């Protein structure tokens, strides 16, 4: 059965849920006229994963049932969108249902394709390879940090659009601090690899970060 909503939001992440909540708070007449389309069972507060990877918080604390975060007055459609039809103001769902809209908000987040980097899919989550960008592997980050004894600790900034550009640097500083507190810093070569030509895009902050990495004896490989 085809459906129509005044506002359709694709994505039940922080962005999609926040937009729906603010619209409903601003205009109560939008109740039952907003749909959030997302196939996921769980909603994750992903900014917390930096602290999960550093052993400061738990993955469980970042996760809630999707149903519990859908704002009152919005309708959750537990489906994936298979195609857009902007000429008809509609989207087609995985079961071929057509959902029509007056306004569309597109906030599906990013899909991580581990297989795009040779060897990464086979090694992610083991063999010293971890990532804070996925609930499947973020706990392995803490496992690697807490069991580190000596060698190279390499933190990489991807050369593609990512969920949080500062995340690789944040976990690097937290790991480096952990190494210092546990008196193994002298055994660690902390390396930050970035495809960019600066640590941060804003000059005054970049200058301060350059001072910090030098002070902490962190090697930065640019470009």
Language-model segments: residues:
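FAD-binding core/adjacent interface of flavoenzyme oxidoreductases
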Residues: 1-5, 75-170, 177-183
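Amphipathic coiled-coil/heptad-repeat helices and related helical stalk/stem segments
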Residues: 62, 137-141, 205
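Beta1-alpha1 glycine-rich phosphate/pyrophosphate-binding loop at the start
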Residues: 2-75, 159-203
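Short, conserved catalytic or adaptor-binding loops enriched in Gly and charged residues
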Residues: 66-71, 120-124, 211-214
């Amino acid at each position: 059965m085809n459906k129509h909503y005044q506002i359709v939001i694709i994505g039940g992440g922080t962005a999609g849920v926040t937009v729906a909540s603010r619209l409903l708070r601003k205009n109560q007449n939008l109740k039952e006229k907003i749909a959030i389309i997302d196939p996921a069972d769980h909603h994750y507060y992903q900014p917390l994963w930096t602290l999960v990877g550093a052993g400061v918080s738990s993955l469980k604390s970042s996760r809630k049932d999707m149903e519990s975060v859908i704002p009152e007055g919005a309708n959750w459609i537990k489906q994936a969108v298979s195609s857009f039809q902007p000429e008809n103001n509609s989207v087609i769902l995985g079961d071929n249902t057509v959902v029509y809209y007056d306004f569309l908000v597109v906030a599906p987040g990013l899909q991580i394709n581990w297989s795009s980097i040779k060897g990464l899919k086979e090694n992610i989550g083991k063999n010293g390879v971890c990532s804070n960008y996925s609930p499947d592997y973020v706990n392995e980050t803490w496992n690697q940090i807490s069991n580190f004894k000596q060698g190279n600790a390499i933190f990489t900034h991807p050369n593609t659009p990512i969920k949080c550009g500062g995340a690789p640097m944040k976990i690097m500083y937290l790991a480096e601090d952990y190494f210092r507190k546990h008196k193994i810093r002298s055994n660690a070569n902390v390396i930050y690899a970035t495809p960019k030509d600066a640590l941060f895009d804003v000059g005054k902050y970049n200058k301060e970060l350059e001072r910090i990495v030098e002070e902490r004896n962190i090697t930065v490989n640019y470009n």
